[in-house]
């Protein structure tokens, strides 16, 4: 905390003048400060040449009026030239009229550098403060970047430009790798909803167990089981596509259709069908449990991972509903069964989305999602570059190869060749044969290397940034003292606004008392600057 202590003085006349040098170091000019707002007494509230006693976080100093008058544009210079107590109060955080004490709640370390500035006229960068905190302190005291010493200015600007936020100035995410207070407070606000809920402590503990794999040993076991079920479901879907299973199940389906029965019950291998039922039961248990334990139902349906969980089980239940609806209508003909088979195939294809469930247990996949969310500008630029390059080189290739009958018959047909060439994939299914076509292909490949590499570098840097932030956020949630937070939640409802205000005032009085107890450690007569 910073405190400016002003000793009591005799007052001067109603109007006074203070000689202030120009900020650029020119000839001194005589500036009229202000007029005293007490016309009946005709005396000024303090002498213009009186020293200021300064207390910054327990560090007390006396600042001479001559030193402050050299820099009238700074906060202390304007305070020294203040013509009334009311004007001075607007420049400080608090003022004790009895002790003539001005109070500032600022960084004491920066104030020591500020004293050096008033002595020498040059401000040096403090390594103990980050560049943004240093800049905020300098702005508060009325110092600009021009006040920086030449030896520190280049280093300050370099550190300011090399901050983590420099790579993403348009992003709305915090620049630090550490989780910001807003992210932690969002988690705490979600947990605070359990305070007034029924069985809040138990629901909160179960919700953290299911949502945070590193929360406890049971949560790690639950995560391992969930990952195993997801992998088993994906493996069953892949095995089902093997030729031997396809031939056997196709014959059984034809026989079922001929008998007027639904082919759904015979298309699956019995072992794979039982495994599918088990996976569906587990996924349904996960979704229903998370829905019941969620602190907010509305936020539950807004979370992307929860939507993925719902989509993973939705095809199975839609297939059952389609079968029941067809059975209620009495449709046993081949046309209805054929439509049902197409619907079932579409629903089966949706099972591939189950692989996205792994994102709940993978920091890398969640970081990838956050990267794509905050990289839409870079992705748009990448697609724009590709579209321009494909259009240009496809037209050139069509002009050079249209007479050769090698697949470049139309410009839209050349788009496929241009896309695989610019992305340096090069399937080789369509290749130019003329010299002009080969030159166009070479330019297309080189242009793809240069154009695609530029946005990809930015996207990769963002992925690394979000990955570190996600790891830090998980560590912060995992290492938080949950028991203390639960005790806090249990007492929130009993605290009224009046008691909160009383606690706030008591805390401020305690802080002032702590500062007063530190005062004797300072010399009784601070050094004059």
Swiss-Prot record:
Domain of life of the native organism: Eukaryota
GO CC term (a single one): perinuclear region of cytoplasm
SUPFAM superfamilies for this protein: POZ domain, Voltage-gated potassium channels
Main location: membrane
Protein name per UniProt: Delayed-rectifier potassium channel regulatory subunit KCNS1
Membrane topology recorded in Swiss-Prot or TrEMBL: Multi-pass membrane protein
A GO molecular-function annotation: potassium channel regulator activity
Intramembrane segments per UniProt: 412-423, 424-431
Cytoplasmic side: 1-217, 294-304, 362-376, 468-529
Record key words, sorted: Cell membrane, Ion channel, Ion transport, Membrane, Potassium, Potassium channel, Potassium transport, Transmembrane, Transmembrane helix, Transport, Voltage-gated channel
Placement of sequence motif Selectivity filter: 424-429
């Amino acid at each position: 905390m910073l405190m400016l202590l002003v000793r009591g003085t005799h007052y001067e006349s109603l109007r006074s003048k203070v000689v202030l040098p120009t900020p650029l170091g020119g000839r001194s000019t005589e500036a009229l400060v202000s007029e005293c707002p007490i016309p009946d007494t005709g005396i000024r509230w303090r002498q213009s040449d009186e020293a200021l006693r300064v207390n910054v976080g327990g560090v007390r100093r006396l600042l001479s009026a001559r030193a402050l008058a050299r820099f009238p544009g700074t906060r202390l210079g304007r305070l020294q030239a203040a013509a009334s107590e009311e004007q001075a109060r607007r420049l400080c955080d608090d003022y004790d009229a009895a002790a003539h004490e001005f109070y500032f709640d600022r960084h004491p370390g920066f104030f020591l550098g500020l004293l050096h500035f008033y002595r020498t006229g040059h401000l040096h960068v403090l390594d103990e403060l980050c560049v943004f905190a240093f800049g905020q302190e300098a702005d508060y005291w009325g110092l600009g970047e021009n006040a920086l010493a030449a030896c520190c200015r280049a280093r300050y600007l370099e550190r300011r430009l090399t901050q983590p936020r420099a790579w993403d100035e348009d992003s709305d995410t915090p620049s630090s790798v550490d989780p910001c207070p807003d992210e932690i407070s969002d988690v705490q606000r979600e947990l605070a909803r359990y305070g007034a809920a029924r069985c809040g402590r138990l629901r909160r503990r179960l919700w953290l167990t299911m949502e945070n794999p590193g929360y406890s040993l049971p949560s790690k076991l639950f995560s391992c089981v969930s990952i195993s079920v997801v992998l088993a479901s994906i493996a069953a879907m892949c095995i089902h596509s093997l030729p031997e299973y396809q031939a056997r199940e196709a014959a059984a389906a034809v026989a079922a259709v001929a008998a007027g029965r639904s082919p759904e019950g015979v298309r699956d291998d019995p072992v794979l069908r039982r495994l599918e039922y088990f996976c569906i039961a587990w996924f349904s248990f996960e979704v229903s449990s998370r829905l019941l334990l969620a602190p907010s139902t509305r936020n539950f349906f807004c979370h992307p991972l929860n939507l993925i969980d719902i989509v993973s089980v939705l095809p199975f239940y839609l297939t059952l509903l389609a079968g029941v609806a067809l059975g209620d209508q009495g449709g046993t003909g081949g046309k209805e069964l054929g439509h049902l088979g197409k619907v079932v195939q579409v629903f089966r294809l949706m099972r591939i989305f189950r692989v996205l469930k792994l994102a709940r247990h993978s920091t890398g996949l969640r970081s990838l999602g956050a990267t794509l969310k905050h990289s839409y500008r870079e992705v748009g630029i990448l697609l724009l570059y590709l579209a321009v390059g494909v259009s240009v080189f496809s037209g050139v290739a069509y002009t050079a190869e249209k007479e050769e009958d090698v697949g470049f018959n139309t410009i839209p047909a050349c788009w496929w060749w241009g896309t695989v060439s610019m992305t340096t994939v090069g399937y080789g299914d369509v290749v130019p044969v003329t010299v002009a076509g080969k030159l166009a292909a070479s330019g297309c490949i080189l242009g793809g290397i240069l154009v695609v590499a530029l946005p990809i570098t930015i996207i990769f840097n963002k992925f690394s940034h979000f990955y570190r932030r996600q790891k830090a956020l998980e560590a912060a949630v995992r290492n938080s003292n949950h028991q203390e937070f639960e005790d806090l939640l249990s007492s929130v409802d009993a605290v009224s606004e009046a008691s909160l205000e009383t606690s706030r005032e008591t805390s401020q009085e305690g802080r002032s008392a702590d500062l007063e107890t530190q005062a004797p450690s300072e010399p009784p007569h601070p050094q004059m600057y």
